[in-house]
Amino acid sequence: MASLLTLDRVTAGFVPDIDILQNVSLEVAEAGITGLIGLNGAGKSTIMRTICGFLKPKSGRIIYNGDEIAGIAPHSTIARGIWYIPQESSLYPRMSVSDNLWLPLEHLRRCGILSRDETHHRVDEATTRFPVLKTKWSANAGDLSGGQQKLVEFAKAFVIRPRLCLIDEPSIGLSPKVAGEIYDCIDAFVSGGMTVLLVDHNVRRVVRTSHHIYVLSLGQITASGSPADFAGDLHEQVKSWLGIEF
């Protein structure tokens, strides 16, 4: 598969003298799932925040669809087809579920990317695909359970239909049932041609789901390979580095 996103020796940090990411290089193949695993504090979320423009790298390049995007503002990355589903809810708690869903669509419409008819069509499709939208349409997002909020987050990605979706810890704190629904969504996204960069504390699930996996340790890529690679010698090395079974 061709590469949609490339990080080339990216170094980044939130303060001048501390680098959370150190010369990170990786590639995300188009229309597939690239998994990123590592211990807490390894820098996985920082990679995602750097890609989508919340953190400007100190050095290195970020190439998306052939264009350099390092340091571009988040609203510009959205218009380019990059969407971020963070670990914490990004919904506006005092806004209704419907308003949370419509807000990014209106941004894309104002950018000339979507027509008004297309935005309505996508919302209609989402209400069929995600039952929580029908039952909680007028409710404030802050009144929803954690699982319901996560499903609304994925409904937003469904209507936006980015080319690249960055998904950070989608199953943390969720019941097995809701976590299964979330991964069904991810599978459907990729089947529809979306590209996914996935981080999840459930390493077994990441290895089973992804087409290619990178291991991050202390801000550096320490291993990478296909799921088959992780069934052999690399499996034993990564178990030793992470101190976990998968």
Could you say what each language-model-derived stretch is?
Residues 82, 88, 128, 215-218, ...:
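C-terminal boundary and immediately downstream tail of ABC-type ATPase nucleotide-binding domains
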Residues 1-4, 11-23, 30, 73-74:
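A short, flexible loop at the N-terminus of ABC-type nucleotide-binding domains that lies
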Residues 140-144:
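Conserved ABC ATPase signature
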Residues 37-39:
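The feature captures the beta-strand-to-loop junction immediately N-terminal to the Walker
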Residues 157-158:
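ABC ATPase C-loop
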Residues 15, 95-121, 129-131, 225:
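ABC-type ATPase nucleotide-binding domains, specifically the catalytic core motifs of the NBD
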Residues 60-69, 80, 118-123:
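Conserved ABC transporter NBD signature motif
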